[in-house]
Regions:
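Compositionally biased, low-complexity repeat tracts
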Residues: 4, 27, 49, 54, ...
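Sequence signature of WD/YWTD-type beta-propeller architectures
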Residues: 119-570
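C-terminal motif of bacterial Sec signal peptides marking the signal peptidase cleavage site
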Residues: 6-8
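Extracytoplasmic soluble-region selector
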Residues: 10-127, 131-132, 177-180, 203, ...
Length: 570
């Protein structure tokens, strides 16, 4: 304390000495700490850290309340700097992982590591196992028994999920005589087990977020085990395992798709557990929809019986181009500025004013050339199409098509340029530009497009070149690669991802008639699936695909279209 006497005053002023004066270094205690959580319930686990200051005179003092505390992985927990417990870290119970704890004062910094490990068992409250203690560590394990071991069938090995997915329904085949199951999620920092009496378990809410937050930095290994409560001596049968990861970047919230449940366009997304009908409010059938790149307009085919005609609406649900004006439509695409709408109908391309519906002419393709499935490039310079010379396509089917792009410049169309050649045994269709315009995703099949079980996803540079098969996305089920005839079609790129630390992946929705675990154990019903793409990869850029949680698995769902703008239709 310093005493100062002021001239002409009778009061003595006391000045408090700076407690950090002459501090030369900082230390954190304890160092390299670990928190192990065996119960995810409250109260939350805490760990008290101390900040120690070293001073020029050789002394060391506790300065915990005088420094700024931070942790570089806020998913693990936080320091309450506004409270009274300085240096007290409270675990979130919402993630396992590693972090760096830092303190700072007077330009000096100290760091230490913190590891949060989750080692817990959860009993399924909805379908509990028939008895307790069926998976005790002392019970013998048998791996790979062809009759008794269960088989994890969803998700597939190597699935990359977005961090905002609402839920994941893990599904497995039971194995003979088994009535109790244990699904284990394992990594360096996570040892989570769920015991259930069912052949499926849904991770949602807090547990879905826990898996996502933990797997962002390292893959999680998932394994299913099974036993029979009525058979002695007890044995635990171990099935296959899969690895899964979660990306840092997420696709937009909104995904529109057609559903046979309503014969209309549904509004959903990866963050939604269910979807609602967007349009129309009547029972009329609409489909083959597309959204303008700015999300302000939605075009679709409207069933006018016997014709299907163009109908467009704005984001508020107001009609722009009414179906009553009878402009035949199969597929459509907006110009990047949203001012023009190119419509394909039975192989003929016609351009319209998107705001008035006025005709702007027919695209000259040349003699015996037909085009369908148009998609306008983000820069407006080209329209990609499925181009055929064999026979005019219908709006439902195209044969022997090539992937081509048609130049466009201020109202003038150029000659179609072939990017991927087609033939009667090599059909290429549904080209779709990536958000940056560098790539085209498209579909390849060995025959006609309608109902093509051989349909698979492909990728090619937008200017042409060697095409890549999206082999994993198109042909992986569970642990098995190159599964044929999964009917993967209708690719749709998500707009630029929402990202936490920088965009790393592109997201591609598509339709596939593949099995979905034990819910849809056989192929044949089209559903919406999504794959993550690493566009920097020199090989197959795709990850194993995941099922869109908001759709109705009992009906056909197709034609996914992403949007960053919500349509409000009353």
């Amino acid at each position: 304390m310093v005493l100062v006497a002021l001239a002409g005053c009778t009061e003595t002023v006391q000045l408090t000495r700076d407690p950090l004066e002459n501090m030369v270094a900082l230390d954190i205690s304890p160092g390299d700490s670990t928190i192990k959580l065996t119960d995810l319930a409250e109260p939350h686990h805490t760990l008290q850290f101390l900040a120690m200051g070293r001073f020029a005179d050789g002394t060391t003092r506790d300065i915990t309340p005088l420094v700024t505390w931070s942790v570089d992985n806020g998913l693990l927990g936080e320091f309450d700097e506004m409270g009274r417990s300085h240096g007290l870290f409270t675990a979130s119970h919402a993630a396992a992982g590693r972090a760096k704890v830092s303190i700072e004062a007077r330009g000096l910094v100290a760091e230490t590591s913190l590891t949060v490990i989750i080692d817990a068992t959860i009993i399924d409250p909805v379908f509990p196992p028939p008895a307790a203690n069926l998976f005790e560590p002392a019970i013998p394990f048998v791996s790979g028994d062809p009759v008794r071991s269960p088989t994890l069938v969803y998700p597939a090995d190597g699935t990359l999920f977005p961090p905002n997915i609402v839920s994941t329904l893990f599904q497995w085949q039971r194995g003979s005589s088994n009535d109790a199951f244990r699904i284990v999620f394992d990594s360096e920092v996570l040892h989570l087990a769920v015991e259930t009496g069912s052949d499926r378990w849904q991770a949602d809410s807090d547990l879905q977020r826990l898996l996502a937050a933990t797997a962002i930095t390292a893959p999680i290994r998932s394994e299913v085990q099974a036993t029979a409560s009525t058979i002695a001596p007890p044995m635990i049968y171990v099935g296959n395992h899969v690895t899964m990861e979660f990306a840092l970047d997420a696709p937009p919230k909104l995904l529109y798709f057609w559903s046979a449940a309503t014969n209309g366009i549904m509004r959903g997304g990866v963050e939604e557990s269910s979807s609602g009908k967007l349009y129309p409010q009547s029972t009329k059938c609409v489909g083959c929809h597309t959204v303008s790149r700015d999300g302000a307009q939605l075009a679709m085919g409207y069933d006018n019986a016997p014709t299907t005609d163009l109908l467009t609406i704005d984001a508020g649900g107001g009609t722009i181009i009414p179906a009553s004006t009878t402009r035949p439509m199969g597929w459509a695409t907006y110009s990047p500025d949203g001012n023009k709408l190119l419509v394909a109908n039975n192989g003929v391309l016609k351009l319209y004013d998107a705001h008035t519906g006025g005709s702007l002419g027919t695209v000259p393709l040349g003699t015996m050339r037909y085009a369908t499935h148009p998609d306008w490039s983000p820069d407006g310079a080209y329209v990609a199409v499925a181009l055929t010379t064999i026979v005019a396509p219908t709006n439902m089917d195209v044969k022997a098509a090539s992937i081509a792009r048609i130049p466009y410049n201020d109202g003038t169309w150029g000659t179609p340029e072939i990017l991927v050649s087609g033939s009667m045994t090599s059909n290429n269709y549904f080209p779709r530009y990536s958000p940056g315009g560098d790539f085209l995703a498209y579909v390849h099949a060995t025959g006609t497009s309608q109902g093509a079980v051989s349909a698979e996803l492909m990728l090619v540079a937008s200017a042409g070149g060697m095409a890549k098969k999206l082999r994993i996305a198109s042909h992986r089920l569970g642990n098995t690669d190159d599964v044929p005839d999964l009917a993967s079609s209708m690719p749709a790129w998500a707009p630029k991802p929402q990202t936490m630390t920088g965009s790393e992946h592109a997201w591609l929705a598509f339709v596939s008639a593949r099995p979905y675990g034990t819910i849809l154990p056989t192929s044949g019903r089209g559903q919406i699936w999504i794959t993550a793409l690493d566009l920097t990869s020199t090989g197959d850029p795709s990850a194993a695909a995941f099922w869109l949680p908001c759709q109705d698995a009992t009906v056909v769902n197709n034609n996914p279209v992403w949007s960053e703008t919500d349509f409000v239709v009353n």
